[in-house]
Amino acid sequence: MRPSIRSAQRFLHPAPGASKKVVREILGVVGLAGLVGLAGCYGHDHFFIAQQPIVNNALWVANGTNVVEFLPSQLTNGTSAPAPHLTLASTVFGAPQGVAFDGFGDLWVIDGGNIASGGMAMPAVYEFTVQQLSNLSKNNAPAPAVTIQSANFKFPQQAAFDGRGDLWVSDSGNNEVYVFLRSQMTASSTTSSTTVAPEIIMTSSTAFNGPIGIAFDGGGDLFVANNGGNTIYGFKASSLPNLNVMSEVTTPNGPPPTPVTPTVTLSNSGGSIQSPWGLAFDGFGNLWSSNAGAASTVVEFTRSQIAATGSPTPNITLASATVSSNATLVSPNGIGFDAFGDLAAVSSAAPFGVAGFGPEQLRTNPTSAPTPDVFLVGGATTLSAPTGVTFGPAFE
C-alpha cells in the first residue's frame, strides 16, 4: 500500500461550485510552508527541504492508545461514523498525545507514557516511516523506526518541526520545551541506545504553566499554549536559542535550561483563553487555539492581535453545536488545517467527535454555534479520548 498520489490543479482555492467531496478527493501538493505542516512547522533560520512532495489531505488522530487514519473520501459532508481506514497500534504505545509529519512524510508520535497510571510505557517520541505506514494494512503494530526517550521527559504532549527539521517538544509535566536536532533523531535509529538528551531545554522567564500547544508561524516565531495558566506565549524567532552554534550534547540530562523571555503574552478575557490546548496557524498567519476548559471553543486571533501583549477578544469563536444529540465540541484538544484551509478539531471528552469546519465557515465570526461541515462521531470511529490531530499522507 503506497501513499495516495493524485495530481492537483489547485491549492487552497478549488473551482467555484466544486463539492467538498470532490475537493477532498484532490491531492494538495504542499509548498514550502507545508513541507513541515500548516499546524506549526514553519521556518526557523532556514527551510528544511523534503525529498518528496508532502501531501496533506488525510486525517490522523492520536487516539487514547493508538493512532487512526481517516481517508479524505471518508470526510464527507454531514454527520457520519466511518471506521478508521488504518490503525497504528504499536505495542510500545502508552498514551499517544500528539502526531506530526516531518518533511519526508514520516509520522512522529508524541507519547506521554502510562507510568503514572501504573503502566510500563515510558514517555517517548516515536517515528514511523513512510514504508511502515504503507504497510499498516498488513502490520498495524510495527516497532518504531526511531525511539527517543529522555531523562527529561515527564509528560510530553505536542511537538512542532521548525524549518530545519528539528523537533520542538512541549512537556506539560516539566513545564519545559525540548529541542532535538535532526541529526540526533537520525542517530537514534542507528545506535542501541534510545536515550537521547535534548540539544536545548527551553524554559520561559515567565514560567510555563502546563505547556501543550506549540506552533511556529511563517516567520519562525514560536507560540506555546499554557494549559494551566490560561495564557499563550509568543517568542520572536530572533529570541530563540541559536541552534546553528550548538553542538550535540552528551550528558544524560542535556544542557542547563535556557530561559527565554516571551515577546508577547496573550491572556484570558471572558473565556477567550481557557485551558488552551492546541495551536495552529492558518494560511493567512492567524493563530487558532482550542479551549479545553469550560468554554469548549475554538478561537482565532488575527496576525495583528498576536503581535502585542494583551487580552484580545477573539476575531472568530467557534462554539459547540448539537447535532443528532451530540455536542460537536467537548473539551477540544488537537486542531489542525488541511491543504485546503479546512479546520479539524478533536473532542477529548464524550462523544469523542471530530468537527470539521470549511474555509467558508472560518471567514467571519458566527452569530451562533455553527454546525460543522463534517462531523465524525459514533462507536464505529473507535475514537476514545482522542487528543492530537494532524493532516498528512493518505495511504490507500
Regions found by a protein language model. Give the residues of each.
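A short beta-strand motif characteristic of beta-propeller blades
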Residues: 82-90, 142-150, 196-204, 259-269, ...
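Short loop/turn segments immediately following beta-strands, especially the blade-tip
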Residues: 70-78, 128-138, 181-191, 235-253, ...
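Short loop/turn segments immediately following the C-termini of beta-strands
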Residues: 64, 112-114, 120, 172-173, ...
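A short loop-to-beta-strand structural motif that recurs across blades of beta-propeller domains
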Residues: 66-69, 123-127, 175-181, 230-234, ...
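Beta-rich, blade/repeat-based domains predominating
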Residues: 44-55, 91-106, 120, 150-164, ...
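Conserved beta-propeller blade signature
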Residues: 58-61, 106-109, 166-169, 221-224, ...
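An edge-strand/N-cap motif at the start of beta-rich repeat modules
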Residues: 44-91, 96-99, 107, 126, ...
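Bacterial Sec-dependent N-terminal signal peptides
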Residues: 2-5, 11, 23-24, 32-61, ...
